[in-house]
Regions:
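A short Gly-Trp-Pro
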Residues: 1-118
Length: 118
């Protein structure tokens, strides 16, 4: 769990940061309304899922990573415990919270692994 500061996530979530939680696809199930879930293929690495009925943004599937980024606010029972900031070089909202801040992404996720200061 963490915060993404990239321009794309900020625009998609209409917020200065996007709180995310990462899951394996096999660990996820849409409990109800699955017939209303639509997908927009932004890039080969990002398949955005949203509700056709209300327009709410739900999650991003990242097939190249084998992970799904479920927006933390869409899981009412989730105890959000952020552990990292990604794409902090693009931030518009500085956060002093002691968490690691990656310039882009960790190396395991295709980034530089470079850290930036708070």
């Amino acid at each position: 769990m963490g915060y993404c500061h990239c321009r794309s996530c900020r625009s998609w979530s209409a917020a200065p940061v996007n709180a995310f939680s990462l899951w394996r696809p096999s660990a996820l199930k849409v409990a109800e309304g699955v017939e209303h879930v639509a997908m927009f293929q932004k890039t080969p690495m990002s398949q955005r899922r949203y509700c056709r009925k209300c327009g709410g943004h739900l999650m991003n599937n990242h097939p190249t990573l084998g992970l799904v980024d479920v927006y933390a606010a869409t899981i009412p029972t989730l105890e959000f415990k952020p552990a990292v900031h990604v794409n902090y070089a693009e931030t518009v909202l500085r956060m002093t919270d002691g968490l690691p801040k990656f310039k882009d992404f960790p190396k395991d996720f295709g980034g530089s692994g470079e850290m930036v200061l708070e």
